Curated annotation (Swiss-Prot):
PROSITE patterns tied to this protein: WD_REPEATS_2, WD_REPEATS_REGION
Full protein name: WD repeat-containing protein 62
Major location category of this protein: nucleus
UniProt source species: Homo sapiens (Human)
Intervals holding WD repeats: 109-150, 153-194, 196-234, 291-330, 357-396, 402-450, 490-529, 532-574, 578-618, 626-665, 671-713, 714-752, 803-846, 1132-1173, 1255-1293
The entry's keywords: Acetylation, Cytoplasm, Cytoskeleton, Disease variant, Intellectual disability, Neurogenesis, Nucleus, Phosphoprotein, Primary microcephaly, Repeat, WD repeat
Amino acid sequence: MAAVGSGGYARNDAGEKLPSVMAGVPARRGQSSPPPAPPICLRRRTRLSTASEETVQNRVSLEKVLGITAQNSSGLTCDPGTGHVAYLAGCVVVILDPKENKQQHIFNTARKSLSALAFSPDGKYIVTGENGHRPAVRIWDVEEKNQVAEMLGHKYGVACVAFSPNMKHIVSMGYQHDMVLNVWDWKKDIVVASNKVSCRVIALSFSEDSSYFVTVGNRHVRFWFLEVSTETKVTSTVPLVGRSGILGELHNNIFCGVACGRGRMAGSTFCVSYSGLLCQFNEKRVLEKWINLKVSLSSCLCVSQELIFCGCTDGIVRIFQAHSLHYLANLPKPHYLGVDVAQGLEPSFLFHRKAEAVYPDTVALTFDPIHQWLSCVYKDHSIYIWDVKDINRVGKVWSELFHSSYVWNVEVYPEFEDQRACLPSGSFLTCSSDNTIRFWNLDSSPDSHWQKNIFSNTLLKVVYVENDIQHLQDMSHFPDRGSENGTPMDVKAGVRVMQVSPDGQHLASGDRSGNLRIHELHFMDELVKVEAHDAEVLCLEYSKPETGLTLLASASRDRLIHVLNVEKNYNLEQTLDDHSSSITAIKFAGNRDIQMISCGADKSIYFRSAQQGSDGLHFVRTHHVAEKTTLYDMDIDITQKYVAVACQDRNVRVYNTVNGKQKKCYKGSQGDEGSLLKVHVDPSGTFLATSCSDKSISVIDFYSGECIAKMFGHSEIITSMKFTYDCHHLITVSGDSCVFIWHLGPEITNCMKQHLLEIDHRQQQQHTNDKKRSGHPRQDTYVSTPSEIHSLSPGEQTEDDLEEECEPEEMLKTPSKDSLDPDPRCLLTNGKLPLWAKRLLGDDDVADGLAFHAKRSYQPHGRWAERAGQEPLKTILDAQDLDCYFTPMKPESLENSILDSLEPQSLASLLSESESPQEAGRGHPSFLPQQKESSEASELILYSLEAEVTVTGTDSQYCRKEVEAGPGDQQGDSYLRVSSDSPKDQSPPEDSGESEADLECSFAAIHSPAPPPDPAPRFATSLPHFPGCAGPTEDELSLPEGPSVPSSSLPQTPEQEKFLRHHFETLTESPCRALGDVEASEAEDHFFNPRLSISTQFLSSLQKASRFTHTFPPRATQCLVKSPEVKLMDRGGSQPRAGTGYASPDRTHVLAAGKAEETLEAWRPPPPCLTSLASCVPASSVLPTDRNLPTPTSAPTPGLAQGVHAPSTCSYMEATASSRARISRSISLGDSEGPIVATLAQPLRRPSSVGELASLGQELQAITTATTPSLDSEGQEPALRSWGNHEARANLRLTLSSACDGLLQPPVDTQPGVTVPAVSFPAPSPVEESALRLHGSAFRPSLPAPESPGLPAHPSNPQLPEARPGIPGGTASLLEPTSGALGLLQGSPARWSEPWVPVEALPPSPLELSRVGNILHRLQTTFQEALDLYRVLVSSGQVDTGQQQARTELVSTFLWIHSQLEAECLVGTSVAPAQALPSPGPPSPPTLYPLASPDLQALLEHYSELLVQAVRRKARGH
């Protein structure tokens, strides 16, 4: 054991600072002095002096053991002189005095689990055997509790040991692989005789005269004679002489127990077999008698001078006469499995028999000849001591019921002064793999509410989860069913974790299957059961009552965190998936404001703050710490200010909960092996206890890191630890099924109590100061507004300054700022480029970059602190800015006559409303299960085609606000502002900070003619200003879009980035998002996953959406773009709909080709780079919430979107925030060669369905036809996005670099005098539509406008020739037009077109736009009426002849309209006239254009046919 290092335990005076982090751990750069100590109010004046190692080991003593690990009679023995019973419990020998109910303990200093023990005949010594490699046979002094002798002679474990009656010899038998049988002269520590036994030996027994001993096992009964072996006067080891018993026809039996006769039966030997046979051998080793016990299985045997006791299954112990083998009686059975011990208040309760009850098997027996007591150990790890003086009146002397399998968690019941307590003071709870939760209390004083039961003096109550008793019996007892060394078998069942609510009324527990249960503690009834996770629940945590909220967070091995609201009957509030691996601990912190901290096996710690929105509470990530080691557990001190984390490298790291900074790092284990598994801070915050995988426990000073005490005794890893609230005990539980209660020394207890008094005194002073300052108004709430969730910047007052001021209240509040600075979009690891890297780059004199402006948002420092992406697309949610920059100058006729009367009547929205009437109020289909919540700031491209605006903010939260028509925006239009970076040849100087205003105008070049290159290019710093609109605010012009970055933190040049790529392999990129809340799933989901847990629905929400998308036909919406900004419009009210936004999985850079030129008349559809993405939004990609998002603009005006919600579509296997911190990509700064470069970086995936392959083929037809040889810019290969559907395993990889670049070229209207008509595509079928919606990169054709009689035909309808090189431009509009938008397009000259369309100038049409709008409005209304009529006819149960005829006519009309549309869209393609069909069916997907490869075309056509057939079969099945 490592000695305690120098340095002393006593602290210095109040002026002492916390020492810097230990050697080997780099201190944070920029710190000129070590971090200060915690406030003086948290210092402990009572000090413990430096102590020796012996004192350290003796400061904590083992008071009580609740558990037993005896597997057979070899693990149970009795002192023949005193009647004390000794049994095994891990690495401890428990010596029990049944009369006094007191325990003594002998510790195995080797820390190996004990396998066998036996008392010496005089009761002064105990011999033990061990498990493991090179086990020892040890002799212990019972009185002194120390080791007398140690004998090494085995290799693989000791199965059984015994003293000879004359105490000269000790016999030890090894396990089967050891095969060694040794006879020891234990006083001389030598082996007298030895031999090898090839079969497995289970038990042995000495004869009364010590002349021989008998071993039994598999087909084995052998007599070993000591006198013949030891008569030879040879000092060396001699062979042990043995003779086999003559078994006769019983030679194939497995014998599990043996006992040599006593008294007049001294010459006989009794054996029992597993098959239930009791055998008697005479002095000549001949089988003399045998009887059938009439049981299915027997396991153990014990004899006295007069009686024989045989332990059998089902709690049976049969009693026979020793001299005649006559059956006398049975012992009373113990409790039945599943008994409610709390009801056993009367002794007669034990003898009540329950019909069809199952009783535990008997596994070990020992007899006390002094008191005539028989001790029995049962298979469920219970112990009974029976008084058998009169076998006709057997009485119970003592009993105890222990856990029979892994004990996973322990919780101490909180203390209450009033009558609210459901349990007596000092109670604690344990849970185990035996599927029970047990309530214990060590207080011997009687309690009126909890009377002591007859089964146990310490066990108050047992909760059998779901009344499951199949795991109560330990399956590792019998050698033919379990492990030989007696290690408990992990059956992957039972309760894994639990937590008591702060009010003491509820108990939350999570099992190993992922279920979450809530029990109320008055009557132990199960209130709630939630199928929460897909894997075992690893941690549960209730929020602190000081926060004003009652939340329950559950985290699991499935890497998800579910936050439940207790006050709302445990409804789900949020699901977080920041972690990329198992979550090992989760804690709530904060007194007035609430924080959530979690750590996991992905080496990440996430600090989150709560934000209250209109739709509930949401946690937003504020800090992310990425360590280099796995984090196994953590705990928070009483001040809620520090969190201690147990790390795999055996260190305890202490972090500040406010800013996430590491404050301390010290050793958590005194050994040199293993990992820290658990950490727990005592109730006073003075000490912390740690457990290591070497099975040791340490008590450490929380502030100095000095080891105060260290203990051992468990034979398996310690799974949980808790200090009691009275500061007297530490309770530990382990995988060895034992619960250890450790008594803390008086010096430790006094320190803890003194510290609590100091804290209480400080709180009283603070309360007095608060009353004095009560005149000052102060907002007191448990959460802060979204705009106040900010990290402290280096220029602001730090937490260390707050410590020096000793203001705990202000210190524990979430820091807030008056300004509306945006949060950093990506939270990266700390530190900067190392010095050696700077020297190689020649940046030795680079400024440290710490002198930021105090108003800048927090920027992490470090060599990985690179912005994951460039400036993202961003929204303006301020009314003045919206009116100023985006409100179009509408013609009076259009504004007055048409637009005011238009209503949003798209087909998809109508169908979605009719399909989900219960969701009509919220405006999204019922099958959309869960909105993806994320607690991070990310960069997204979002396109809103309807009333709901979906974008991302930089405030680390996604929100949604319904768009309402305001005074200046009567159409309820949705707006989007686009920010972008400049291309390589127009990038600003490196030292110039890019403001938001600088980046806004750069996007105009996509829509305006490209001017000649500027010799000194810079972005325009002024925004367009229209008459009647307020100009841009000063905040808007000065606010940076992202955090200001020091020049030494980011690669500023291509050379720097190449250097980073070379030395660091990858660069940090933006983290991914999370899915959202779940709703009840439908019956169809049982086909995919019968167990529909919250996590399952969370991860499969996009799969469900993709399965149902084909039932919703495409919408007809069109967006208009006004240069230089992007305006997304929706003609309609404020009711939000799903399927209107798309969240880019990674990031998108849109680089401007030139400066903006304002033209008020330059209205045109958006460029293909936007419409292609906006058109392919899946129906489930937008799920509305009601949260508010702060914006970096002034106060928003009601009626406009104040917040947006941007759920993304992450699959289960995609990178999370923590994984992206280590596996990342970067966009090379020197790879852009064209005037326009767009990078759509998406993770690799497989196609999610066969229909997706079909849609991909149609996309490729349009894309490959549009590519031109002149596009030579280097584009990245786009990767296909995964929606979590694993049905299709095909891997289709296509290189579309030139196509993607071509899509972002300026439209052809950049060439003066060139205008071409827009090209339309045929409407996709519902099957095709569903396939198209699956793609994040799909290019969906637009729906054409139906030809109406009032609309004159176009003069010409040219054919579509092949692609012509050299024609710049983009692809056709890929958005589905609304009626108003079509009227605008057809009433004004088209300004852009496809690159392959011949260049022809077309005269404008004289048609009035208002007339077009009226026609389209009537068309929509009529079609809707026809559709409603058809739906009624189809849904009616009884169909007469008239209804059938009407149905047929409607179908025929619909098909005729469809064929006419196809004939008009597919120019030059002959379409057969529609034929009436008896029932509607989905039309076959039209072929757009021939593919370049015939093989690929055939493959895609084949997959398309398969998909159509599958959909039809599914439709017929429903």
